[in-house]
Amino acid sequence: MKKLVSLCLALLLLVSLCGAVLAEDKPYAGQTLTISTFAFNAELLQKNIYDPFMEMTGCTIVADGASNAVRVTKLAEAAEGDYDVVIIGDMFVKQLMAEGKIDTLDTSKLTNLDAVYDNAKAPMGEGYGPAYTFNRLGIVYNPEDCPIEITSFADLWDPELRDYIAIPAITNTSGPLFYYGVAAAFGLEPGKDDDAIFAKLAELKPNVKSTYTSANNTITMLNQGEICAAVLLDYSYTTAKSANPAYVWVNPAEGLFGGYNMLNVITGSKNKELAELFIDFYLSFDLQYAEAMDGVDCPVRADIVLDEEHAQNFTYGEMVNQLILPDWDFVTANLPGWTERWNETFSVK
């Protein structure tokens, strides 16, 4: 009997020791990290990011996916502590910062930050989160349907494209980039020459079938032949080309207007240490490489080398240094006025 009791005690001790080891290996077991993120590529994000991070830490990830604009509203209305991390475009980071929704973070904990391109380390200032991918604005068109060859933003004004193109709404992630592109096409300057820029947009209106807020819907319009060309960010080209390999990507002659998608901690996060670990994980070599191989995001790590096939759709290599990046403080200050004038221009066909 004594031997049986001793054996049971030994087994209990072994189980408790195993539990202690597991707890030490996964110190975040039982914690839930709530992320506000994009709605697309959910399966690939689960495979490349969420599942490996949960396996590594023992935490549970809840990913709330929606468009940038919808998420800004949700975050503004959320109670403190409802969210931990926001993954969103640069223009919307500025809006959230102005509303006090973005917390600073301890960049000394980001062990992968040194491998990131300098202009992606702290785009919104020291103490705020890094970019995890670049993007650039271009034109996707179907040469089988399009009556002209397109090489520039200025080509979109060609009368042969009447009611045949899509452009981003000014409130879309790429909207301000297109505004800058229009200005460059005609030798104008945002802020200084707004009257002239909107006059050019009014001239473009007969060609515009859609001012979109959803890139996916715009690609559907391309596929159905409702439009022959669309102004899109580069990552949308991967989706478009998978539907029709004939689609052509154009780096506009006016230049590479671009920006970032970024990672930040939400003010009031109950899991800030875990949130910072997640942001660092997002910058890791294996994760960035996997995302690039799957055509999800271009890497911000300078040490990742892509073959021609995987690099062709991304803002990669020398292009990173060629990006024309808007002053987002300036854009944020002017966006309400631009939006009002945009709606006046495009609300009635």
Predicted regions mapped to residue ranges:
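Paired acidic/hydrophobic, glycine-rich loop segments that form the ligand-binding mouth/hinge
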Residues: D84-I87, T211, C228-L233, W249
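Short, low-complexity disordered leader/linker segments with a strong preference
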Residues: M1-L33, V348-K349
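Conserved C-terminal helix/tail region of periplasmic/extracytoplasmic solute-binding proteins
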Residues: I324-K349
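A ligand-binding cleft/hinge motif common to bilobed small-molecule-binding domains
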Residues: F92-Q95, N223, A229-A246
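Mature extracytoplasmic/periplasmic domains
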Residues: F257, N261, I266-P326
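Early extracytoplasmic/lumenal segment of secretory-pathway proteins
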Residues: K26-Q95
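Periplasmic-binding protein-like
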Residues: N135, A199-L204, A243-T267
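Extracytoplasmic ligand-binding site segments that recognize negatively charged/polar headgroups
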Residues: A39-Q46, D82-Y83, I87-N223
